[in-house]
């Protein structure tokens, strides 16, 4: 708010007359800094009259040090006029120039003014502890406001202002202390007042306990999420042995099976928990103590373990026993072992024949083939994935054995030469050993049969064939189909 607006024209004219009278005083006829005659400007903060040149320098110092006003043109406030009346040039210089040398050269007036008011170079050492005139000005302002001519409704004295400032924080602190005291709990005054709150607390505790019971019952009523997993697990079981094993006692199953049984019987255990936890909710009387809740939680595991756990491990092992799928690598290993056994049988038959003619050797080999094919038709009930066995049953197997015996009998005729053994093409399923002769044929690098007659003459004498030289792949041609 601009305080100059409150100054009326009559008051402004009165202030102007006062200032003109102050300028006529002998101490104020010269500038306070440069001693120029006829000053028309004044420093409101310092309470001195200065010339126009020094007024510009005072403006550069800042309003916190010197606030410049025109003595004849500007509007003055009542407190400013009262302060400059009390100060004047002589009184102000007695403070600012207390230690100034008597004939000091004031040529550099700007440096002189800055050293005088900013640096306080010539202020007496004892006077530096005292307040400068501008502080006294503030005090005078408060005194001016307390006068009867000041119409702004301020306090009567600066002392009262200071006392009011002290009382305001004190009252605030008292209110804060009172507020904190209200938040503190009130101590009990007698035994009669203590008994009633205890009864209220007991009555209030019963609904809280009932709410806790309701909260405990609510989760048990939710549908169990484990049922989906158990249903999926029951779908994977392949036999009905679980119904027989459910009658076993818990001690019959090992420790690791109990974990699987606990996983499968989780659904039935939750149903038992539903029945047990619903009983306190149905009863109207509240529980006597917290031990009842502990008993409820202690009883629930016993109910869940009453049912005998199912032999889940047996069900899982039955899955592996019932399966008919075997890896090709395992099947290949079994076939290699069987072929090695057949070779041993052929070698034994060849040694037993000794120098017998070719027909006898062929008969022994045919008998060995009957035994090997009977064992090899369905080894262990396994089947190679992607291949089917054409032999449907025992009747087909017997027909195949009869055909093999007929072929063997045809080969045992004495008039048949050695080259009759070439009637079966070499299309073996597995190539055994290195490039050996098979029925007078030698396999080349391209897999095509090549007659041994091109490399060596055909022997007319009967020679015994070993088991590894016999090729029975033609008999099994078509038994395996490609996937």
From Swiss-Prot:
Region (Disordered) residue spans: 123-226, 238-310, 434-483
Compositionally skewed regions (Basic and acidic residues) per UniProt: 123-144
Consequence of substituting residue 59 to Q: Impaired ARF-GTPase activity toward ARF1 at trans-Golgi network
Recorded GO MF terms: clathrin binding; GTPase activator activity; zinc ion binding
GO cellular component: clathrin-coated vesicle; endosome; trans-Golgi network
Residue span(s) of domain Arf-GAP: 16-130
Ranges of biased composition (kind: Low complexity): 278-291, 449-466
Effect ascribed to mutating residue 51 to Y: In nev-1; impaired floral organ shedding
Family matches, as CDD domains: ArfGap
Keyword field: Cytoplasmic vesicle, Endosome, Golgi apparatus, GTPase activation, Metal-binding, Zinc, Zinc-finger
Keyword Zinc-finger in annotation: yes
Function noted in UniProt: GTPase-activating protein (GAP) for ADP ribosylation factor (ARF). Mediates clathrin-dependent trafficking of vacuolar cargo from the trans-Golgi network (TGN). Promotes plant growth. Involved in the regulation of membrane trafficking and cell separation during floral organ shedding and abscission. Prevents abscission zone (AZ) cells enlargement. Exhibits ARF-GTPase activity toward ARF1 at TGN.
Protein name: ADP-ribosylation factor GTPase-activating protein AGD5
UniProt organism field: Arabidopsis thaliana (Mouse-ear cress)
């Amino acid at each position: 708010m601009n305080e100059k607006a409150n100054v009326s024209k009559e008051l402004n004219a009165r202030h102007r007359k006062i200032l003109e009278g102050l300028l006529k005083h002998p101490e104020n006829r010269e500038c306070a800094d440069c001693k120029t005659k006829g000053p028309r400007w004044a420093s409101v903060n310092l309470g001195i009259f200065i010339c126009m040149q020094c007024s510009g320098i005072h403006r550069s110092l800042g309003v916190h040090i010197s606030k410049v006003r025109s003595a004849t043109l500007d509007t003055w406030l009542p407190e400013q006029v009262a302060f400059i009346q009390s100060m004047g040039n002589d009184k102000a210089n007695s403070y600012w120039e207390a230690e100034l040398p008597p004939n000091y050269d004031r040529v550099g007036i700007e440096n002189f003014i800055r050293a005088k008011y900013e640096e306080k170079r010539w202020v007496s050492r004892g006077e530096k502890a005292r307040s400068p005139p501008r502080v006294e000005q503030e005090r005078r302002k408060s005194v001016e406001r307390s006068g009867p001519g000041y119409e702004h409704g301020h306090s009567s004295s600066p002392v009262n202002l200071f006392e009011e400032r002290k009382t305001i924080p004190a009252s605030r602190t008292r209110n804060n202390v009172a507020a904190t005291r209200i938040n503190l709990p009130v101590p009990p005054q007698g035994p009669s007042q203590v008994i009633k709150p205890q009864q209220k607390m007991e009555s209030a505790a019963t609904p809280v306990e009932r709410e806790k019971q309701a909260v405990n019952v609510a989760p048990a009523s939710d549908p169990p999420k484990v049922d989906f997993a158990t249903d999926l697990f029951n779908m994977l079981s392949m036999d009905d042995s679980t119904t027989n094993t459910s009658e076993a006692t818990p001690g019959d199953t090992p420790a690791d099976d109990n974990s699987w049984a606990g996983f499968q019987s989780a659904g039935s255990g939750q149903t038992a928990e539903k029945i047990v936890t619903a009983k306190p909710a149905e009863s109207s009387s509240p529980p006597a103590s917290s031990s009842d809740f502990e008993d409820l939680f202690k009883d629930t595991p016993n109910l869940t373990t009453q049912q005998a756990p199912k032999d889940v491990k047996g069900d899982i092992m039955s899955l592996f026993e019932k399966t008919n799928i075997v890896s090709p690598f395992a099947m290949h290993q079994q076939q290699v072992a069987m072929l090695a056994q057949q070779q041993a049988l052929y070698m034994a038959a060849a040694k037993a024949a000794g120098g017998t003619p070719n027909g006898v050797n062929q008969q022994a080999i045919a008998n060995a083939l009957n035994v090997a094919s009977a064992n090899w038709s369905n080894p262990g009930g396994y089947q190679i994935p992607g291949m089917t066995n054409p032999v449907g049953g025992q009747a087909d197997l017997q027909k195949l054995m009869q055909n093999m015996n007929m072929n063997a009998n045809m080969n045992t005729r004495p008039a048949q030469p050695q080259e009759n053994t070439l009637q079966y093409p070499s299309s073996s399923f597995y190539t055994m050993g290195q490039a050996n002769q098979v029925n007078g044929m030698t396999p080349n690098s391209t897999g095509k049969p090549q007659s041994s007659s091109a490399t060596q003459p055909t022997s007319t004498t009967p020679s015994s064939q070993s088991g590894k030289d016999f090729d029975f792949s033609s008999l099994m041609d078509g038994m395996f189909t490609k996937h």
